[in-house]
């Protein structure tokens, strides 16, 4: 009985998410953010003339540039 209880306790601890982490979209797939990263962002930038580049992911603070979006819920930056 003790073994069963101990096994159940170990499985519970392993499967339990001990801290909430934000999930954000990246250009290809999803990204689980680090605990300190509290925001998702989506930003369009022009590295070269007439060639927009989309950047997406987790961030510590919201970008302030033009054509950027910042949010703080799971998968909100699609």
Swiss-Prot record:
Gene3D superfamilies: CD59. This three-finger toxin binds and inhibits the nicotinic acetylcholine receptor (nAChR). SUPFAM superfamilies: Snake toxin-like (SSF57302). Pfam families: Toxin_cobra-type. It is found in: Secreted. The record marks 48 as: Key residue for inhibition of muscle alpha-1-beta-1-delta-epsilon (CHRNA1-CHRNB1-CHRND-CHRNE) and important residue for inhibition of neuronal alpha-3-beta-2/CHRNA3-CHRNB2 nAChR. Keywords: Acetylcholine receptor inhibiting toxin, Disulfide bond, Ion channel impairing toxin, Neurotoxin, Postsynaptic neurotoxin, Secreted, Signal, Toxin. Belongs to the three-finger toxin family. Short-chain subfamily. The record marks 67 as: Important residue for interaction with muscle alpha-1-beta-1-delta-epsilon (CHRNA1-CHRNB1-CHRND-CHRNE) and neuronal alpha-3-beta-2/CHRNA3-CHRNB2 nAChR. GO terms for molecular function: acetylcholine receptor inhibitor activity; ion channel regulator activity; toxin activity. The keyword Signal applies. It comes from the Eukaryota. This is Short neurotoxin OH-5. Residues 1-21 form the signal peptide. The keyword Iron-sulfur does not apply. Disulfide bonds join 24-40, 33-58, 62-70, 71-76. Expressed by the venom gland. The record marks 44 as: Key residue for inhibition of muscle alpha-1-beta-1-delta-epsilon (CHRNA1-CHRNB1-CHRND-CHRNE) nAChR. The record marks 46 as: Key residue for inhibition of muscle alpha-1-beta-1-delta-epsilon (CHRNA1-CHRNB1-CHRND-CHRNE) and important for inhibition of neuronal alpha-3-beta-2/CHRNA3-CHRNB2 nAChR. The record marks 28, 43, 51, 66 as: Important residue for inhibition of muscle alpha-1-beta-1-delta-epsilon (CHRNA1-CHRNB1-CHRND-CHRNE) and neuronal alpha-3-beta-2/CHRNA3-CHRNB2 nAChR. One of its GO terms (cellular component) is extracellular region. Its main location: secreted. The record marks 45, 47 as: Important residue for inhibition of muscle alpha-1-beta-1-delta-epsilon (CHRNA1-CHRNB1-CHRND-CHRNE) nAChR. InterPro entries: Snake_3FTx, Snake_toxin-like_sf, Toxin_cobra-type.
């Amino acid at each position: 009985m003790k073994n069963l209880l101990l096994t159940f306790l170990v499985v519970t601890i392993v499967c339990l998410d001990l801290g909430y982490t934000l999930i954000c979209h990246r250009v290809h797939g999803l990204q689980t953010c680090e605990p300190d990263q509290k925001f998702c962002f989506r930003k369009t930038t022009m590295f070269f003339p007439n060639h927009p580049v989309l950047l997406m992911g987790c961030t510590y603070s919201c970008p302030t540039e033009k054509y950027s979006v910042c949010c703080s819920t799971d998968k909100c930056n699609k």
